[in-house]
Regions:
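Short N-terminal "domain-start" leader segments
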Residues: 1-34
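DNA-binding interface regions
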Residues: 2, 31, 41, 77-79
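A short, exposed loop/beta-hairpin motif centered on an aromatic-Gly-Thr core
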Residues: 5-7, 43-57
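Short, mixed-charge low-complexity intrinsically disordered segments
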Residues: 14-21, 59, 68-88
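A short local loop/turn or secondary-structure capping micro-motif enriched for an aromatic residue
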Residues: 25, 38-40, 70
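Short beta-strand segments and strand-loop junctions that repeat across beta-rich extracellular domains
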Residues: 33-35, 64-70
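Acidic Ser/Thr/Pro-rich low-complexity disordered segments
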Residues: 34-46
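Well-ordered alpha/beta subsegment
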Residues: 56-60, 64
Length: 88
């Protein structure tokens, strides 16, 4: 599975998006996890999952999702590690 991480600064918290995609069993899947990092810690919701019969369909959707996410002001990160600014 491949993973992409995105962050978006939102007032006193950092919103996070994680895209996992690849072959799972006999299907190609994309899992989108939305989360948040704030003064109380980190949390991540259950994923939204998309299934595809063909790899090319999945890769096209990953490409479209990446473009849409970036157009909405999100930044792509290399890892899941994100520093949260202190508001003390």
């Amino acid at each position: 599975m491949n993973t992409l991480f995105f962050t978006h600064q939102h007032q006193r918290s950092t919103k996070t998006l994680r895209l996992n995609y690849g072959l799972e069993g006999m299907k190609y899947i994309i899992q989108v996890y939305e989360g948040e990092i704030n003064g109380r810690g980190e949390k991540e919701g259950l994923p939204t999952e998309y299934q595809y019969e063909f790899e090319q369909e999945m890769l096209k959707h990953v490409h479209d999702l990446k473009n849409e996410i970036r157009e909405n002001g999100w930044f792509q990160r290399d890892t899941q590690e994100v520093s949260q600014t202190s508001f003390l």
